[in-house]
Amino acid sequence: MNDSPIARAILRYHPDWEPPPDHHEWNKCLCPFHGDETPSAAVSYDLQGYNCMACGVRGDVISIIRHEEEVTFAEAKRIAENLSVGGNVPVQRKPARKPSRRVFGESRAGRPSGTKPVRSGIRGRPTPWT
């Protein structure tokens, strides 16, 4: 099952690891993340997950990449996309969007035309005793 994304992610960092054949939902295997002589880990090709009972490494493709490379979720997702079939296609980066909240002291030039500012509640009203 070397064509599975979870197997490709593990083989990227541990090329000597042998993926187990796909017999069950969770297939026993030797853990590549620590020295292992008896199978203490399991990989699921259906769920695209990995779990080691001995060292505690578990997760999906992105969490394994984050564990090994110590990168953010977005960077791990880009790496995982390159591991997938047809991974030679460059990943499109979205342009940074302008934040929707206005910063204190920022001009109101972006206000739509024809609108007037809202008066403040009590301070805009005359007091009855003046």
Swiss-Prot record:
The keyword Metal-binding applies. SUPFAM superfamilies: Zinc beta-ribbon. One of its GO terms (molecular function) is DNA binding. Residues 85-130 are annotated as: Disordered. It comes from the Viruses. One of its GO terms (biological process) is DNA replication, synthesis of primer. Keywords: Metal-binding, Zinc, Zinc-finger. This is Gene 58 protein. It comes from Mycobacterium phage L5 (Mycobacteriophage L5). InterPro entries: DNA_primase_Znf_CHC2, DnaG_primase, Znf_CHC2.
